[in-house]
Amino acid sequence: HVDAAWGGPTLFSPRYQGLLDGIAQADTVTLDGHKQLLVPLGTGMLLCRQPDLMMTVKREAPYAIRASSFDQGRFTLEGTRPANALYLDAAFQLLGQQGYAQLIDANYDRARRMAELIDAHPAFELMSAPVMNLLSYRCIPPHLQGKALDEAANEQINAFNVALQKAQRAEGHSFVSRTQRAVSRYGTQPLTLLRAVLLNPLIEERHIRGLLDDQLRLGSLIASQLFDPTQQQGPVV
């Protein structure tokens, strides 16, 4: 099985489809149209090489269609069908493979440009080079920039990025989500990371720069409130 819920549309891009080499060997593939195919929420698909594989996830409800019923209809993961497939069909009629390829290429290129801007600034730490159009990074408070980071320092940075993400969301001018995971260079310690998703086809570099500028501005304010300016050793108590 291949979970291609997010990355599946990469196949439409001649430039990037090599990232999914081998997917044709899968027995089943999941794909969410409401992500990179830009159609309404709930357009999820399970693609099966052999249709009878659907029988392995079959469930009969005793109050509806039973095995002895005359007409069981088509097997499906949905009960009442909202016809979301029409959204997908309309999008393909409008954009086609070439249109989706242009969107995929542009978004993946934007993610790489954002990664370059992050990597070039001492106040940010890029966790890894983006493969598609998702990237994770974190903002480093001024007193820890350019220093070797141990577990205690990472705990300070975690608290700093939680506060930063909340402040940016509350301000309402720009937004990224946050996540938590271990990064190999820091061992098994969970790190709080900022998570950017480059999906809107109308995003330009000026928007990306504006988002990062917002984080720098808010980060400076938060650092002055969160950390002791005289010792710079940890959160103010």
Residue ranges of model-derived segments:
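Catalytic PLP-binding core of fold-type I/II PLP enzymes
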Residues: 1-14
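A glycine-rich phosphate-binding loop feature that marks nucleotide/adenosyl-phosphate handling sites
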Residues: 5-6, 61-63, 106-109, 128-138, ...
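Active-site C-terminal subdomain of aminotransferase-like
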Residues: 12-16, 21-122, 128, 143
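C-terminal, well-structured subdomains that either form a transmembrane helix-short loop-helix hairpin
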Residues: 30, 107-108, 118, 127, ...
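Generic non-transmembrane alpha-helical segments
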Residues: 113, 117-121, 163-172, 214-225
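Conserved PLP-binding catalytic core of the aspartate aminotransferase-like
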Residues: 126-168
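PLP-dependent enzyme catalytic core of the Aspartate aminotransferase-like
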Residues: 147, 185-237
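Conserved PLP cofactor-binding pocket of PLP-dependent enzymes
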Residues: 167-190
